[in-house]
Amino acid sequence: MLERATRTIKTAGLLLAAYFVLNIVLRIVLPHSLELDEAEQSFFSQYLLAGYGPQPPFYNWMQYAVVSVTGISIGALIVPKNILLFLSYLFYGLAGRRVLKDEALAAVGMLALITLPQVSYMAQQDLTHTTALLFASSLFLYGFFRTLDRPDMASYLLLGLATGIGLISKYNFALMPVVALIAILPDAEWRRRALDWRMLAAITVALVIVLPHAVWLQGNLAFASSDTLVKMAAGSEPAGAVRIGKGLLAFLVAIIAFAALPVVIFAATFRRDFVRALSAGNRWTGMMERMMLASLAGIALIVLFTGSTTVRERWLDPFLLVLPIYFLAKMQAAGLDLSAGLRRFRPVLPVLMACVLIALGFRVVGAGLIGTYSRPNVPMAGFAREMTRQAEPALVIASDTYIGGNMRLQFPDVPVVIPDFPAPGIPAYAEAKGPVLIVWRGKKTATAADAVMPERFSSALTAAGIALQEIGSLSLPYYFGRQGDNFALGYAWVRPETR
């Protein structure tokens, strides 16, 4: 059965489609309290802007388009994400077919993406912008490999489309076309692909996609880069050898964490064939090696020049995504009979799928057993119900996008704002035609007394001339939580007649 499912990209795609449908069903069955990125998308989907903050806007634009048609719901947040992930696998398989020239092997390579934890588990858990990056990276690999294999206008346009989408998905994607160019320089035939006049069409497509955000970025560069720089520079070490050493060590650990599972699985299933293939190669494996080495060298230089002490595995997504195709191409180049290894490898794939689904479910329903709570465990529906027993809000002012996005899901017909977004201050307050509900978050495991308003939020309300009345706080038990483990929210009402 598994052999039939991996015979072609189409049959493997059907297996993947069923898997992603199960992921959608699982998330809909779990509590509808949102993860951090889900909440951000819920909140930002009220606006169509050229830029939203530290992350590029591709996913926000896609989410805005979906919500504009369907309205806000858990399905409107989850289904598009799973479609993007499905397309990531599909384009990866199509890229693999260009390299491997064997559709059955390409189908296995497509499914082998699930051996990368950053793709299979972390992207499902949250990470909306990383999901967009995975999609763009797979599309880029397909466009790039297709252009190298059999160039035509469609392949160049696809390459430009992928580059444009990638650049407005995650800023680290900017390294991808650079390392791709470096990787083909030693090959005279492939070098001509980069000098082909059709490359101008690819560049034009990419520029058209990027231009609106690039114009916004020009005036908001500090704002857009602040979050990334803070994450990269986290650490208390002064500048110098110790800081550089810590950064390079973090980089090495990230590489190992990213690549360890696929290396172990391929080595365990293909055994000696995997080891023997390490010394084999062809022009495709050489090109992929140069891509990976150039990208890792680029990241190492960034670590050195910025003094970064933090490198996260997901930052390596576009650069090491090619690993499963690379491993299969190496073994194919060695001229080995892979049938025995493939028989051992195929059963691993549904096992990993099941493990991902179980882990995603257990982290929520088993939270009380392990004592660590995820954001879906927070009883947002209960908070919304308790806060609005006496009145329905005409406007919700939230302390941050996490609270704002959850409130938007609970009150889909009510505008939700946070201070200083999308305009300075809270201009929506003056325009509200009814009661205004103000909400802020307390501590994770808390009593109602712990729902103290953040000082920054308090200052923003004061600056906007908002005087709070009817201040309250709530502490409700987590979904699937231990007795006594609560989450706290603070809230206040401002009535029209008292403003």
UniProtKB/Swiss-Prot annotation:
Function: Involved in the modification of the lipopolysaccharide (LPS) inner core. Catalyzes the transfer of a galacturonic acid (GalA) residue to the 4-position of the outer Kdo (3-deoxy-D-manno-octulosonic acid) residue of the LPS inner core, using dodecaprenyl phosphate-GalA as the donor substrate. GalA addition by RgtA is required for RgtB activity.
Record field: transmembrane: 11-31, 74-94, 103-123, 125-145, 165-185, 199-219, 248-268, 291-311, 316-336, 351-371
Protein's name in the database: Lipopolysaccharide core galacturonosyltransferase RgtA
Lineage, broadest ranks: Bacteria, Pseudomonadati, Pseudomonadota, Alphaproteobacteria, Hyphomicrobiales
Encoding gene, per UniProt annotation: rgtA
UniProt xrefs under PANTHER family: MANNOSYLTRANSFERASE YKCB-RELATED (PTHR33908), MEMBRANE PROTEIN (PTHR33908:SF11)
Knockout mutant characteristics: Cells lacking this gene produce a normal lipid A structure with GalA at the 4'-position but a modified LPS core structure as this gene deletion results in the complete absence of GalA on both the 4- and 5-positions of the outer Kdo residue and incomplete addition of GalA to the Man residue. The mutant cells are also more susceptible to deoxycholic acid when compared with the parent strain, and more resistant to the polycationic antimicrobial peptide PmxB.
Pathway where it operates: Bacterial outer membrane biogenesis; LPS core biosynthesis
Keywords: Cell inner membrane, Cell membrane, Glycosyltransferase, Lipopolysaccharide biosynthesis, Membrane, Transferase, Transmembrane, Transmembrane helix
Biological-process GO terms, alphabetical: lipopolysaccharide biosynthetic process; lipopolysaccharide core region biosynthetic process
The protein's Enzyme Commission number: 2.4.1.-
Main location: membrane
Pfam families: PMT_2
Any one GO molecular function term: galactosyltransferase activity
Membrane topology type: Multi-pass membrane protein
Claim: Amino-acid biosynthesis is one of the keywords in the record: no
Organism: Rhizobium johnstonii (strain DSM 114642 / LMG 32736 / 3841)
Claim: Cell inner membrane is one of the keywords in the record: yes
GO CC terms of this entry: plasma membrane
